[in-house]
């Protein structure tokens, strides 16, 4: 059997999906509050930058993978308009339910689907844009997921990955203290769940750095891959194209 990482823990590949699902079932109801606390609200600016770079226009078809509580899908649905199509998807039913309800409460009706990014249930060359924000690091076979994203995007379209990355070196020690001490403490105080937030910190540490992710996207068949460091590399936005 093949092994993979669940945070720092080595587990069988068949176990990882269930363990990740357990984390997000646990955090779903407090996800937005915790995002604001953990990032000091910066996650909103990171997503705004992603939305600006996406360039969604009326009539566009957009797939938001691991869309969680729907921040990107909400913006894209407004930009794509009634002639467009924006799918909010997530592999976790609890997260998808929170995202769907949040969009409905804002008066936004857009299709939602449970979706495994390694087996995307859409035809080839269907979307103008595919996005995944803070979800790739939780996937077992990242290159396979990226190849699937490339498959369903149209020639001329983009795949965009917004994810925690390698922080600027002078900030590493302070960032580690925050990630492994403060973050689990916040998780316990606000959500009553320190272990899930400890996993989130560990999953960030185990995720490929900026250059490694460029190579991974290129291996998946994407071209002209570039990245933008945000907040000293705490987060990076990677953009790959299909021709």
UniProtKB/Swiss-Prot annotation:
EC number(s) per entry: 2.1.1.163, 2.1.1.201
Cited Gene3D superfamilies: Vaccinia Virus protein VP39 (3.40.50.150)
Keywords annotated in UniProt: Menaquinone biosynthesis, Methyltransferase, S-adenosyl-L-methionine, Transferase, Ubiquinone biosynthesis
Keyword set includes S-adenosyl-L-methionine: yes
Domain of life: Bacteria
Residues where S-adenosyl-L-methionine binds: 69, 90, 116-117
GO BP annotations, alphabetical order: aerobic respiration; menaquinone biosynthetic process; methylation
CDD domains documented for this protein: AdoMet_MTases (cd02440)
Catalysed reactions, semicolon-separated: a 2-demethylmenaquinol + S-adenosyl-L-methionine = a menaquinol + S-adenosyl-L-homocysteine + H(+); a 2-methoxy-6-(all-trans-polyprenyl)benzene-1,4-diol + S-adenosyl-L-methionine = a 5-methoxy-2-methyl-3-(all-trans-polyprenyl)benzene-1,4-diol + S-adenosyl-L-homocysteine + H(+)
GO molecular function: 2-methoxy-6-polyprenyl-1,4-benzoquinol methyltransferase activity; demethylmenaquinone methyltransferase activity
InterPro entries linked: SAM-dependent_MTases_sf, UbiE/COQ5_MeTrFase, UbiE/COQ5_MeTrFase_CS
Pathway: Quinol/quinone metabolism; menaquinone biosynthesis; menaquinol from 1,4-dihydroxy-2-naphthoate: step 2/2; Cofactor biosynthesis; ubiquinone biosynthesis
HAMAP family: MenG_UbiE_methyltr (MF_01813)
Function, in words: Methyltransferase required for the conversion of demethylmenaquinol (DMKH2) to menaquinol (MKH2) and the conversion of 2-polyprenyl-6-methoxy-1,4-benzoquinol (DDMQH2) to 2-polyprenyl-3-methyl-6-methoxy-1,4-benzoquinol (DMQH2).
Family designation: Belongs to the class I-like SAM-binding methyltransferase superfamily. MenG/UbiE family.
PANTHER family xrefs: 2-METHOXY-6-POLYPRENYL-1,4-BENZOQUINOL METHYLASE, MITOCHONDRIAL, METHYLTRANSFERASE
Name by which UniProt lists this protein: Ubiquinone/menaquinone biosynthesis C-methyltransferase UbiE
Organism expressing this protein natively: Cupriavidus taiwanensis (strain DSM 17343 / BCRC 17206 / CCUG 44338 / CIP 107171 / LMG 19424 / R1) (Ralstonia taiwanensis (strain LMG 19424))
Source lineage: Bacteria, Pseudomonadati, Pseudomonadota, Betaproteobacteria, Burkholderiales
